[in-house]
Amino acid sequence: MGEFSILLQQGNGWFFIPSAILLGILHGLEPGHSKTMMAAFIIAIKGTIKQAFMLGLAATLSHTAVVWLIALGGMYLSRAYAAESVEPWLQLISAIIILGTACWMFWRTWRGEQQWLTGSHHDHDHDHDHDHDHDHDHDHDHDHHGHTYPEGAMSKAYQDAHERAHAADIQRRFHGQKVTNEQILLFGLTGGLIPCPAAITLLLICIQLQALTLGATMVLCFSLGLALTLVAVGVGAAISVQQAVKRWNGFTTLARRAPYFSSILIGLVGLYMGIHGYTGIMQ
């Protein structure tokens, strides 16, 4: 615990640990396979709050295992290149990769949002014209659609193309079916195995820190933030995503903006590491 105490005394822990927790929360809020698949699965099987907890914790467990493997591998490699002359260069290279990851996430989020806005505008124009030409038929079809596919309200929230495809497939396969707890756990475990830029960021941070205890603590904090979000999403889906969206209009906006905050946070971490690496090289 000595290295952890020193880093805390220097104030580094108060930057990295909250950042890891926030990064985990934001990662869970981002439009992505785990969150969308979980919500679609819970709604399709009409799952209970207990099942939502199970699904969220299972997804977090497998996702955390991947992060642990990546982070521990990074710390193992960092021990092999622990020379003081090499470490600043590793910090600078890590910072460049992190900043590149942040820019890619920001651009991908912006592009996805523009596509979603374009699609929403097209749908609005179509509905507007349809109301004028076939008012009676439109009202009838709309009511019937609402009663037959209540989970379809999810499509009104911002999702990328992969999310919509996965959610639609899950709803078709599991709609109204009874599933066992083992199937729920397996679904959660497999859904959490998808790697993410946040895990890569944790890997590079651990390489920069040269600290096993703090690195492990960061992974734990990231997992805690992710678990909070995934469990909350699962429980929210079990209670009703429709009600959450109806009662708080900011829910959709928050989910849409979360990747921006996440990319900015990753960028700040990369900038912090880059400054330290550059300072070490100049010395």
UniProtKB/Swiss-Prot annotation:
Among its keywords, does the record have Cell membrane? yes
Q: What Pfam families does the annotation carry?
A: NicO (PF03824)
Major location category of this protein: membrane
Q: Where are the transmembrane segments?
A: 6-26, 52-72, 86-106, 184-204, 219-239, 261-281
Q: Where is this region: Disordered?
A: 120-149
Q: Does the keyword Transmembrane helix apply?
A: yes
Quote the biased-composition stretches of kind Basic and acidic residues, using this chain's numbering. Answer: 120-148
Give the top-rank taxon of the lineage listed in the UniProt record for this protein.
Answer: Bacteria
Q: Which residues lie on this side of the membrane: Cytoplasmic?
A: 27-51, 107-183, 240-260
Q: Which ranges of this chain reside in the Periplasmic compartment per its record?
A: 1-5, 73-85, 205-218, 282-283
Q: Which GO terms describe its cellular component?
A: plasma membrane
Q: What induces it?
A: By nickel and cobalt. Transcriptionally repressed by RcnR.
Q: Enumerate the subcellular locations listed in this protein's record, separating them with semicolons.
A: Cell inner membrane
The record's annotation in Gene3D superfamilies points to: Nitrogenase molybdenum iron protein domain (3.40.50.1980)
**How is this protein situated with respect to the membrane?**
Multi-pass membrane protein
- Keywords, in A-Z order: Cell inner membrane, Cell membrane, Cobalt, Cobalt transport, Ion transport, Membrane, Nickel, Nickel transport, Transmembrane, Transmembrane helix, Transport
Query: What GO biological process terms are annotated to this protein in UniProt?
Result: cobalt ion transport; response to cobalt ion; response to nickel cation
Mind listing the GO molecular function terms for this protein? Answer: monoatomic cation efflux transmembrane transporter activity; nickel cation transmembrane transporter activity
State the protein's purpose: Efflux system for nickel and cobalt.
Q: Which NCBIfam families match?
A: PRK10019.1
Query: What is the similarity comment for this entry?
Result: Belongs to the NiCoT transporter (TC 2.A.52) family. RcnA subfamily.
Can you name this protein? Nickel/cobalt efflux system RcnA
The gene coding this protein: rcnA
